[in-house]
Every structure is written in structure tokens, then in C-alpha cells.
Amino acid sequence: MALSPNRSVTIKDVANHASVSVATVSAVMNKNKYVSPELAQRVRESITALSYKRNSFAHGLKTRVSYKIGLIVPDITNPFFTNIARGVEDVASAHNYSLILGNTDEDPEKEKKYLQLLESKQADGLIIAVTARSHEYLQSLPIQHLALISIDRSLFDLGIDTVMVDNRAGARTAIEHLIALGHRRIGLVTGIRGIAPTEERLLGYTEALEKHGIAVDPALIAVSYARVGGGERGAMQLLALENRPTALFMMDGTMAIGALQTIAKSGLRCPEDIALACFDDFTWAAVMQPRLTVIDQPTYEIGQQSAHLLFERLQNRKRAPREIRLQTQLIVRESCGAMLR
């Protein structure tokens, strides 16, 4: 099939090349009607052969979609959210969607500005890890046209699709592992209070202690924030206690780096003098000295699942909301002291 070099390839050209109707090409591209595998493959081969690229703007005018979705997270530099973003983007790209990314730093005002931006850009959907104080606030926002998915923070009680891990079980597993190693004074450094991950992990911590007959000591719980500096501050508070803990559990991987820095500055050794474990497993956790014992979260899968849910919601706005809870995994390395036994 010879085309003029100055003319753009059209959907009609693809249909002629594949010997199918324009409607069949459209169905294959939009994935909204059944097409036999043989015909679908023929269409895809013609699209590749002709280097056809759909005009998303023109298509959007016809279908009233923008081919844009938003992803709003507290901090994209946190590897937890970096991996989630990659999972979201891979699925979005497969659906020919672009991604608009925003960082809130847990600030409701910044969150509001990003939501207003998405409104102005007429985004079709939004995946969000809401700020600590924004549940009622979200209900009041003019975002009714957006398909909405919550990650890492539960909004299921508001009828919103949610994807997150079983934080309670993950924390309980970590604390029981430390107890099995002989620790009874286990310090906990939390993130911001009032958000689901913090509250659920705190509950898992207390459940594990109570199950083994260990009283919960409020002095062993330090409230901080999910950054390296937050880990330093929280660990410093706990190590300054007259009867300091023999083990620390950090609610975030970046906080564990800060904890290790504080342990070293205090003249202590990890794990010989104090054991350490944390949520989140990243590449550096396996190469640090000591290598970190972690509760691994399937971050890329969280991103994928949330994006899949979003596109399901775009196809069917009336379906019942779903909550997906993914499982965590304990990975035992050196920092907990298990290798010393």
C-alpha cells in the first residue's frame, strides 16, 4: 500500500491495509468490543506496518475523554511511591494515557491545588494517597467527574476503590520476629498519626506485644515523619531513654537510614547492641551494612492494581467499590540480629 509521504496515516488506511472495517480497527484500539484474535492481530500488524498513531486530541473531542490521569502522592522521592508510580505509568501507557504527577508533602493545601489542576486539565481519573486530614475535605471537592482510586490510605468507607497492603499483619509479623529473638523492649517509630498505614501498623505492634504478654509502654512509641530526618529524630528520642529499647521497628524504609545514623552517633552497634527492622524493601536495603531486615511491600503491584481498577471504573462508573489488600513478606537479614544466633 503506497501512501504519500506528506499525508498522515488515517484509521481508514489501517482498515484498508488489514482488509477490515474502520469499526473493527476502532474496537481493537479501544478494547471496547469483542474482535476475534485473528482479526485483532491483523489490525495490530497493520498499525505497526503503517506506523499509525491516533490523534488523541481529536479522538478525545469525539469521546469526551482527555486521555490523562493524575497520580498524587506525598513524596515521589520515597522509593515506595517511586515504584508505585512506575506500576501506574506502565498500565496507563498500555491504555494510551498520559500521567500527571503531583507531590503533596502531606499538605492538604498542596493537594487541593493539584486537584484543581486536574480539574482544569479535565483529567479522566485520579489515583491518590490522600493527606492525613483530608477525608471530609475530599467529599466536599468538585471532582465528581473523576474516576477515583485511593492507594496506601483507605477510603473504602467512602465508597472509593482502595489498594493497599495488610499493614496490621505486616507489623505484627515483624514484632513477633523480634520477640522470637528475645526482645521485650521494642521501640516503635511511627509516621504521621491519623493515616491508615500508621494506625494499622501501630495496631499490629500492640497486638503482637499483648499476644506475648508484654505490656505496651507509651514511652517506647515515638511519633515522627517518613523521611531520613524523621528516623533520626525518632530513634534519638528512644535511645535517650534511661531504660532504652533493645530493638527498633521503623514504619518506613527511609526512616531506617536515619535510625542507623543515630545508632552510630550514639556509639552503639547494629545489631550487636540494638536490633533494627523496618517496613519497605528496596535495592539498597540488601547492600547496606548491616543488611536490613524488612517487611516487603509489593509496591509495583500496588501501582498496577490501582491503575487496572481505575480503567475498570472508567468503563463502568456504577460498579460496586472494591478494596484490594495485598500481602507483605518478612525478609530476614542482618540488622535484626538473627544471624548472630
Predicted regions located by residue number:
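Short beta->alpha connector loops
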Residues: 105-108, 129-134, 254
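Short gly/ser/thr-rich secondary-structure transition/capping motifs
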Residues: 5, 49-55, 109, 129-131, ...
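Short acidic active-site motifs
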Residues: 56, 110-114, 136-137, 230, ...
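Short beta-strand segments enriched in small/hydrophobic residues
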Residues: 17, 22-26, 61-77, 177, ...
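N-terminal helix-turn-helix DNA-binding module of bacterial transcription factors
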Residues: 1-67
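Bacterial carbohydrate/catabolite-sensing allosteric modules
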Residues: 1-5, 49, 90-95, 119, ...
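Amphipathic helical "hinge" segments at domain boundaries
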Residues: 50-117, 121-125, 203-206, 210, ...
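Short catalytic-loop micro-motif centered on adjacent basic/acidic residues
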Residues: 100-102, 127-128, 188, 294-296
